[in-house]
Amino acid sequence: MMRVHTHTRLCFLCVLTLLYHQCSHCHEGGSHHHHGHNHGDHDHIHSDLQISEMSCNGLSDRLVHGSQGEPAENEQRYYIHQLFCRYGQKDRLDFKGFQSLLLSLGLGEVRVVGLEHEDLGHDHVAHLDILEVQDGRHSHSAGHPHSHQNPNISHKTHQHSHHENEEHTLAEDVPCSKTLGTGATPPSVSEEHDHDHEHDHDHDKDSDHEHNHRHVTDSPQTQDHEHDHIHLHTHSHKQDSDVTQRLELDHDQKSREHAQEHNDLSDQNHHHHDHHHHKHPHPHLHAPESVVHTTSAMPKIQPSVPPELPANQTRRHRRPSKVKAHRGRNRTSVTVTQAVELETSGDDHEHSLQDHSPAQQQRGRREVPGSPAHGVLHQHEECLNLTQLLHQYGLSSDSLISPVQFTYLCPALLYQIDRRFCILHYHHVEAEEQVAPSSGWVWMWGFVSITIISLLSLLGVVLVPILNQSCFKFLLTFLVALAVGTLSGDALLHLLPHSQGDHDHNHGEQMEEEPEVDFLIKFDGVWKGLTALAGIYLLFIIEHCIGMFKHYSDQRGGLCHKKKKGEQAKIGRKLSDHKLNRRSDAEWLHLKPLTEGDGTTCEAGHNDTQMTELQPLDSPSKMPLNISDSDHPYEAPVKTEEDNVPKAKSKKHGHGHGHGHGHGHGHSHHGHCHSDQEMKDAGIASIAWMVIMGDGMHNFSDGLAIGAAFSANITGGISTSVAVFCHELPHELGDFAVLLKAGMSVKQAIVYNLLSALMAYAGMVIGTAVGQYTHNVTSWIFAVTAGMFLYVALVDMLPEMLHGDSEEHKRCEMGHFVLQNFGMLTGFGIMLLIAIFEDHIVLDFGF
């Protein structure tokens, strides 16, 4: 059959005027039209595979009635509607909602399965179920079928039945925007140029050239027209029947003029007319950013052909290269037409590749969203977080995901689920070798950290000149209690939970956010340690209250007894003085010097009149006084009895004064003074050695912990050093206070504190070596350290709080009790805060 291409060109020039007139009326009047415009590739960039939105005013029924993709379209729209209602807002998915969807699917971050689950299998659902058990969201019983879904999503059974218009009727539906459920264009997209023209090209009645293209309503058997252009451009304006009628009249008039100019086309059989591309401008010029969002894109894109194809369907295979070029030219920034063929009609529209202008061919090389831009390959073989996923699709974290964009993202989500990139087993994680820090940096940071912490022992020097004597005693009481609280709190709240493996010190490896876990479950070991501290504190309060009650009852009940006892002591003292005054100086020489043991007893009992009894003057055992036999190294002159009276009184007074101030008087008290000084030195030495050993073990354990942490990670070691510094500050001041209370000078206390601080270097060396050259020993180091801390706190320092200097405590016992409680509670609180927030104490220096 003859084809007249010249007249076809003239026909297109006429249609050009018609389309320009129709387009202007369409935009001004805002009416909906379906134009079956069968022209090929003009200067607009609409894709031939572009699928439009279906509006909510009933046109969707006419468009998809009888279509092969009708069930798929409605099913797709239904499930997208449900997902957007659950995770989206106003028919859009924001970043937070999409993130929740990814986490529900087990995507977006790498998660480690730490439980054995051979009986459950290794499918994706089983892994998600086990991860929920690990997170504490639910637990399994012995006979549990292990078929949970995400507990964060309410289980609802939506029963939907298909009616004639294939609209879903939900039995239980979440209230959502009606526009999405019916397939209408979302509000944010309705502003774009989405045209939905319906033009009936009714030419002259004498002509067989009828353009009545309702491609969707015509069945494939009756469609012999080889036209693949489906321009179903939806427009968001309301339909105006008056404007539509007026446009149809104008259209009929233009069609008649068109038929009169081209009468020779009336004899043509239009069923086999091939529309070739012609170089003429087209009024439908849309910017590349013109996006057609649709929830019904998938139904029109069918991978299979209709059951019955027309006879001229074989034309489709004659020029495959031109068809591919035509499809490749119509890629837009959002619609994906790659490797998809339109099969809803049996028409074919052939374009000549040579007819495309260079500008048109350049526009045809647009990339599909998600394809590598500028030749840069995207990372697909790893677990992608939401930001990476959106970036690969040309979106940002601020973008709102439309239903069409969501359909493009779905293959990536399915691929991530199928390849199991985001779920790993614990043995796979442990098998990955971690890059160990340099040994030089480990040793250097360890020594620097220990040196800074050890210098805290010099901090006590600053406190001595500032405070007076009375305030300093109260400060010492507070610091001792603070040391007890920090030591016992660090052992029970920090070290023991770490030794049990609740969480480790590798802070640098925990920078990524972990899924939220119940606060009580996450710090279960810390709460149990806090309960143990509560038991210690309760018994301390009970024992201290019992001692205070006993002290006050003794003061109240023994007041009269003490007065009576004081009067008897005065009478005895007078009699003793009278007896002593009757003795001469020669008789005083018969007094035996007190032995060291007597001096010790005298020091303990504070008895001023404790002496050896003199022999009576008329005693038969009285021997003549011989000065040479005297044990004294010097000679005493013999005085008269009158001169001896004041001397005896002065001797008695001097002896008593010597006991009160520790000064020796005469030959007899010299031995007692020597014994008291030795005892004092022995007591100081004992306390000093106890502090050196106790505090030294404490510093040694600190060095072990710091060395082990630095050997694992530089950043984690610095964080551990910060935690040690926080409890070493009150502990070193507490030790300084204990040494001062033992009778040491400030200089001696500083020296002993520095000696104990040297043990931290030894601990750091051992901890670093063990951490670098052994495996899984750090937890045992923490356990040993916790035992040492408890011993120092409960055996050495807590008794000092309970049984301190009775004279000082009796003066203001309630004040000391309040300070002790405040110090212990402060220490407990410091260690509790470190135990809870230590993962956030991370100092990243880029190592």
Swiss-Prot record:
Disruption phenotype: Morpholino knockdown of the protein causes delayed epiboly and deformities of the head, eye, heart and tail. Glycans are attached at N385. Its main location: membrane. GO terms for molecular function: monoatomic cation:bicarbonate symporter activity; zinc ion transmembrane transporter activity. Undergoes N-terminal ectodomain shedding. Residues 162-171, 190-269, 629-646 have a biased composition (Basic and acidic residues). Zinc-influx transporter. When associated with slc39a6, the heterodimer slc39a10/slc39a6 has a functional role in epithelial-mesenchymal transition (EMT) during embryonic development. Slc39a10/slc39a6 heterodimers play also an essentiel role in initiating mitosis by importing zinc into cells to initiate a pathway resulting in the onset of mitosis. When associated with slc39a6, the heterodimer controls Ncam1 phosphorylation and integration into focal adhesion complexes during EMT. This is Zinc transporter ZIP10. It comes from Danio rerio (Zebrafish).
